[in-house]
């Protein structure tokens, strides 16, 4: 990935400059912070039977790969990889920067609102079919 295209921390911080509180979601392998119109995802330094995120370099590689793969279907959603650094010395932590969408655009919210979902599901199915038709 071209590092010149990556968002800088000053660019990512601008999106949080409005003082919006962060909403944090945690899984066994990562943490996602929702701030303003951005979502920031970091990989935890964990090792399991199926993955190894134990080093910053490994987490960097995984983040770059995730962005590259997911930009194929969601180029406007996956914005790049930035880096967080703390007050202590040490390597900066890679963070995936994504566009945050309103909760009202989640399929769960659409279903719960009673809005018909057939068109949404058809659009998803069509996009997936086109994607897989072009796969090698």
Describe the residue ranges of each PLM region:
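Conserved ATP-binding subdomain of kinase catalytic cores across diverse folds
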Residues: 2-136
